[in-house]
């Protein structure tokens, strides 16, 4: 299929070339950029809706500001694909999120036009403020622009940064990309005129002069003058909250109208004083009918047909782990009216949309606010409820202090379903669930579980629902299950007890999580090589099954631990127990397989696990090496002594 014709975009491969174009050409450039974006993402998959919504804004920013000297920071980075196309990466845009290709987010190592990496939300204003202060300290006249969506503004970190920026009176431009307004975008000449007026140098100079005069008045008159001015501006614009934080507010303006965007951005650029917030109203999926009609379904997409918008979905061999969690929790909630669910702006991603349909009054979406979500759940637990605080592994990191201080120290029975455990493929290191086992198993009294398949996940949901002695977590990966038979309802597992899945005599493979299937495949291959192999499912990283570990250590020559986590997790706890229990004293050969001590780049999960040695081949190779055998399983001949 031929690529779309983009004659203007072809002339603007970098921002300096873009800035050479006359303003009257920019609307056509934006349309070509939108066409290129749709065509590229249709072949790669990725985040489409957010990028379509900021096409005109991206063109305007790079036309008005002197990037990369001026810094543009994209919060989260979902919307940065148009930015990548315009900043010298168009020739690689069809490698998005592929192994060895472009990242799906901004990335410092990828381009000088990406001054700050992003993927988690609400960091842009803090980073931008740091850059703005650094520029001032260095005597630079650099503009720093943070582009943040209204969803990211639900996180407290954004307001902490704005409060600090206002107090410092820093030269920082924040663009609030509001794509979720319940009213239509502002239209007409009056709206555009007001935005130009309040962003202009004359208005702001008069306003500053009036402030200086007002400071000489009695305080009660100062307050009245300030409130009158705020009321008058808020009548047209509505920026009182941001003004209270010390920002000069401009907007709202139509983010798809370059005739409105360009003069406002120029005015703000040319006025070198204090922090400014520009409120821009956009539409997710703008310019592509299927995405406009169903913005939620086109936030993140698989490959799709550009004409019909139909997404390609590979056939599922089994329900996803996320769906199994959601349906299992519904089943438990039918038996226990104390069960409630908490999510931090990810009801669909965590499967709690299903729970919400069944129990709308027992699910709470707190927004992008993981810290609040954890302590909110702790409050529910303190009153006798059974909160399931479902958060992706990577996002639980944001609420770790609350996990320690508000949940663990008080031993409150908050349940933590941890989705996206292990590698997540195309989203790369920013979204990998590598660290939760380590940072949760370090906490006294915390029960830490990992499901090896979808049936085990159902058992762990039931176990967590029944467990009231303290905090408990269970982790499970992204993607489909392995296709095992599912019980109608899970069983309650004995805390701290694993299970033997396959009996052997020489080699023991102890798995924590869904690498169990690879361990079973490795056991078959090892058996064919004459190495009788036991496979065990640990189930618990804390408390460990000491009896199971003793048996594996005493009855086998080789013990290999296998997990989908970073250094310091399950294997570390097993090794500590082996050492303190004296089980290493008799010459047991112990090996630990885990994620490498690097941030693995994006790629296909299977290939990434193979790279880490966490597939069947890697496990077999590890056992052979421990027994001094070659890759065919033959005993290696001793190296002859040479004088």
From Swiss-Prot:
It holds the Pfam family Transket_pyr. Pathway: Metabolic intermediate biosynthesis; 1-deoxy-D-xylulose 5-phosphate biosynthesis; 1-deoxy-D-xylulose 5-phosphate from D-glyceraldehyde 3-phosphate and pyruvate: step 1/1. Mg(2+) binds at residues 150, 179. NCBIfam families: dxs (TIGR00204), PRK05444.2-2 (NF003933). HAMAP family: DXP_synth. Homodimer. Catalyzes the acyloin condensation reaction between C atoms 2 and 3 of pyruvate and glyceraldehyde 3-phosphate to yield 1-deoxy-D-xylulose-5-phosphate (DXP). This is 1-deoxy-D-xylulose-5-phosphate synthase. It comes from Brucella abortus (strain S19).
């Amino acid at each position: 299929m031929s690529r779309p014709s983009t004659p203007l975009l072809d002339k603007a491969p970098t921002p300096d070339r873009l800035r050479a174009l006359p303003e009257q050409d920019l609307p056509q450039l934006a349309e070509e950029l939108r066409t290129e974006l749709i065509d590229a993402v249709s072949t790669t998959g990725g985040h489409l809706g957010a990028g379509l919504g900021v096409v005109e804004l991206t063109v305007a920013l790079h036309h008005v500001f002197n990037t990369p000297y001026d810094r543009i920071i994209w919060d989260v980075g979902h919307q940065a694909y148009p930015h990548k196309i315009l900043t010298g990466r168009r020739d690689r845009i069809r490698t998005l999120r592929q192994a060895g290709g472009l990242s799906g987010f901004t990335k410092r190592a990828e381009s000088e036009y990406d001054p700050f990496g992003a993927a988690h939300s609400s960091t842009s204003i803090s980073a931008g403020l740091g850059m703005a202060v650094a520029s001032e300290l260095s005597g630079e006249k650099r503009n720093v622009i943070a582009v943040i969506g209204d969803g990211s503004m639900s996180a407290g970190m954004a307001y902490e940064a704005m409060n600090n920026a206002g107090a410092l009176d820093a030269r920082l431009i924040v663009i609030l990309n509001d794509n979720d307004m319940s009213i239509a975008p502002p239209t007409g000449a009056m709206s555009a005129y007001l935005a130009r007026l309040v962003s202009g140098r004359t208005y702001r100079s008069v306003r500053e002069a009036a402030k200086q005069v007002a400071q000489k008045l009695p305080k009660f008159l100062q307050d009245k003058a300030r409130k009158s001015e705020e009321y008058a501006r808020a009548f047209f614009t509505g920026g009182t909250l941001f003004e209270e934080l010390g920002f000069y507010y401009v907007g709202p303006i139509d983010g798809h109208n370059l005739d409105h965007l360009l003069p406002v951005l120029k005015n703000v650029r040319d006025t070198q004083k204090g922090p400014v917030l520009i409120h821009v109203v956009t539409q997710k999926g703008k310019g592509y009918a299927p995405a406009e009609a169903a913005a939620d379904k086109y936030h993140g997409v698989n490959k799709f047909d550009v004409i019909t918008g139909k997404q390609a979905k590979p056939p599922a061999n089994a329900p996803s782990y996320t769906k199994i969690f959601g349906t299992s929790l519904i089943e438990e909630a039918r038996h226990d009216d104390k069960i409630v669910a908490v999510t931090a702006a990810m009801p669909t991603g965590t499967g709690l949309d299903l729970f919400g349909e069944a129990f709308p009054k027992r699910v709470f979406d707190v927004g992008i606010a993981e810290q609040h979500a954890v302590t909110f759940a702790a409050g529910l637990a303190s009153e006798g409820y059974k909160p399931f605080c479902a958060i992706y592994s990577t996002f639980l990191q944001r609420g770790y202090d609350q996990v320690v201080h508000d949940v663990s120290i008080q031993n409150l029975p908050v349940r933590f379903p941890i989705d996206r455990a292990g590698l997540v493929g195309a989203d790369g290191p920013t979204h990998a669930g590598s660290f939760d086992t380590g940072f949760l198993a370090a906490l006294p009294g915390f029960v830490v579980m990992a499901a090896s398949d979808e049936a085990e996940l159902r058992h762990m949901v039931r176990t967590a629902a029944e467990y009231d002695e303290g905090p408990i977590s269970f982790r499970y990966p992204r993607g489909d299950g392995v296709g095992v038979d599912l019980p109608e309802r899970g069983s309650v597992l004995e805390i701290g007890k694993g299970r033997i899945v396959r009996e052997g005599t020489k080699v023991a493979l102890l798995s924590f999580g869904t690498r169990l299937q690879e361990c079973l495949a490795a056991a078959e291959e090892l058996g064919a090589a004459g190495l009788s192999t036991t496979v065990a499912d640990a189930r618990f990283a804390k408390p460990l099954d000491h009896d199971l570990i003793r048996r594996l250590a005493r009855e086998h020559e080789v013990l290999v631990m296998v997990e989908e986590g970073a250094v310091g997790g399950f294997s570390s706890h097993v090794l500590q127990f082996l050492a303190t229990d004296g089980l290493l004293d008799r010459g047991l050969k112990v090996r630990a397989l885990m994620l490498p001590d690097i941030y693995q780049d994006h790629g296909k999960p299977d290939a990434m696990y193979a790279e880490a040695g966490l597939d069947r081949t890697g496990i077999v190779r590890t056992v052979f090496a421990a027994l001094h055998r070659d890759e065919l399983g033959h005993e290696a001949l001793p190296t002859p002594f040479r004088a």
